[in-house]
UniProtKB/Swiss-Prot annotation:
Name assigned to this protein: Dynein regulatory complex subunit 4
Gene: GAS8
Single Gene Ontology BP annotation: flagellated sperm motility
Region of interest (Microtubule-binding), ranges: 115-258
Annotated organism of origin: Bos taurus (Bovine)
Coiled coil residues, start to end: 27-201, 246-427
Location(s), subcellular: Cytoplasm; Cytoplasm, Cytoskeleton; Cell projection, Cilium, Flagellum; Cytoplasm, Cytoskeleton, Cilium axoneme
Biased composition (Basic residues): 1-12
Region described as Disordered: 1-31
Region (Interaction with SMO): 357-478
Keyword Cytoplasm attributed: yes
Domain of life: Eukaryota
Entry-linked PANTHER family: DYNEIN REGULATORY COMPLEX SUBUNIT 4
């Protein structure tokens, strides 16, 4: 479009050339066509002029608006400059105030730290003093118990020796008594056996003598009868001549009588033999009874010996039972005394543990609250400081300087917090070591930890591991 405008300006200077021809050389149609093109260009130029006028009006309007906005922004910038100057003044004042507060906080923190250290030192000294006193008391009690135990052992040994001597004397005396009784019983039963044997022999001899006398009497009677019969027979033979038939009859009668007498005598002899056998049977029975009596006497001797041994063992057992009962009573009294001492130690230990736990718990609670308060205050101050920095839009160099100072203050606060945590860990460690020491003492005195009645509290800060270091070292917080 720019060359066409140059062509329009060249019309007034010379004859325009259209399509390589002068207007004079153009035909009517070409001229009309050329005029149509010129009109189209004129319409297009008018449209472009209208468009550029609209653009110019818009640009002018935009320029006016921008100029007014620029003036407004300049006014706002001047206001902001004034506000920044005022904010800078306020910020300087707040920084001075914060510095003063930080100084006060540092002073208060240092004072509280000094007080807590002094307090912890005093408490530790008191606890150590109490611990030493209790340890001395326990050692004295242990020495007294050992001395008493040694005395009781010596007394028991002397008593056992005396009891053994007495027991030996009693056993010897009892043995002599039993031997004497055995000898007396043996002599008594030997005498009884001898008397029984003599009595049985006398009875046997008497019965035999009676039988012999009776048999001798019977034999004498028979001999007398035989003599009488012989005399009668002799008289008969002397008188046979007088009456042979009567004699024969009488002889027959006599022979029959003699046969009867002989049968009677044979029967009597059989009865005497049977009576002898009957007398021999009681003698045999007496002999068997005597052997049975001897066997019974032997079993009686064995039973008597067993009875003697049983009585001796019974007496020994009764003496041992009396001794054991006496020892049981002595041990029971010692047990009651040791139990009372254990109860006293248990009450002392319980009161000491509770007191130490209360002191340590209170001290730990105070330290934790102080640490939490300091951490919360530091976090609050940091948030406020960040808000002030964000609102003040300070120079980067000044911001860096202030940030460095704040970091120094925070670092000092963190170091103070670590010192407090370390001090808290040392106190917890001392408390736990004291608990371990008391538990060891209880085990040394034979008191089970389950009989204490409560579980000692191992102090530790929540979420941290304090006071757990090897070989008495204090663990730092993690």
């Amino acid at each position: 479009m720019a060359p066409k405008k140059k062509g329009k300006k060249g019309k007034g200077k010379g004859t325009p050339i259209v399509d390589g021809l002068a207007p004079e050389d153009m035909s009517k149609e070409q001229v009309e066509e050329h005029i149509g093109r010129i009109r189209e260009e004129l319409d297009r130029e008018r449209e472009e002029r209208n468009y550029f006028q609209l653009e110019r009006d818009k640009i002018h309007t935009f320029w006016e608006i921008t100029r007014r906005q620029l003036e407004e922004k300049k006014a706002e910038l001047r206001n902001k400059d004034r506000e920044m100057e005022e904010a800078e003044e306020r910020h300087q004042v707040e920084i001075k105030v914060y510095k003063q507060k930080v100084k006060h906080l540092l002073y208060e923190h240092q004072s509280s730290l000094t007080e807590m250290k002094a307090e912890g030192t005093v408490v530790m000294k008191l606890a150590q003093k109490e611990h030493r006193a209790q340890e001395g008391t326990l050692r004295r009690d242990m020495r007294a118990l050992k001395v008493e135990l040694k005395e009781q052992e010596l007394a028991n040994e002397v008593m056992v020796k005396n009891l053994r001597l007495k027991h030996t004397e009693e056993i010897t005396k009892m043995r002599n008594d039993f031997e004497r009784q055995v000898r007396e019983i043996e002599a008594k039963y030997d005498k009884k056996m001898k008397m029984l044997r003599d009595e049985l022999d006398l009875r046997r001899k008497t019965e035999i003598h009676e039988v012999e006398e009776r048999k001798n009497g019977q034999i004498t009677t028979l001999m007398q009868r035989h003599e009488e019969a012989f005399t009668d027979i002799k008289n008969y033979y002397n008188d046979i001549t007088l009456n042979n038939l009567a004699l024969i009859n009488s002889l027959k009668e006599q022979m029959e009588d003699m046969g009867k007498k002989e049968e009677h005598l044979e029967k009597e002899m059989t009865e005497v033999a049977m009576q002898n056998r009957r007398l021999a049977d009681p003698l045999q029975k007496a002999r068997e009874e005597m052997s049975d009596m001897q066997k019974k006497l032997g079993s009686y001797e064995r039973d008597k010996q067993i009875l003697v041994c049983t009585k001796a063992r019974l007496k020994v057992t009764e003496k041992e039972l009396k001794s054991l009962r006496w020892e049981h009573e002595v041990l029971e009294q010692r047990f009651i005394k040791v139990q009372q001492e254990r109860d006293d130690l248990y009450h002392k230990f319980t009161s000491a543990i509770l007191e130490v736990q209360q002191k340590a718990g209170f001290r730990n609670l105070v330290l934790e609250r102080k640490v939490q308060a300091l951490v919360a205050a530091v976090e609050k101050k940091e948030v406020q400081f960040n808000e002030v920095l964000a609102a003040s839009n300070l120079d980067p160099a000044a911001l860096t300087l202030v940030s460095r100072k704040l970091e120094d203050v925070l670092e000092s606060k963190n170091s103070a917090i670590k010192d407090l945590q370390y001090e808290l860990a040392r106190v917890c460690k001392a408390h736990n070591d004291l608990l371990r020491t008391y538990e060891a003492k209880l085990l040394a005195f034979g008191v089970p930890l389950d009989n204490v009645g409560f579980k000692p509290l191992d102090t530790a800060v929540i979420g941290q591991t304090l006071g757990q270091g090897p070989a008495g070292l204090v663990g730092t917080p993690t």
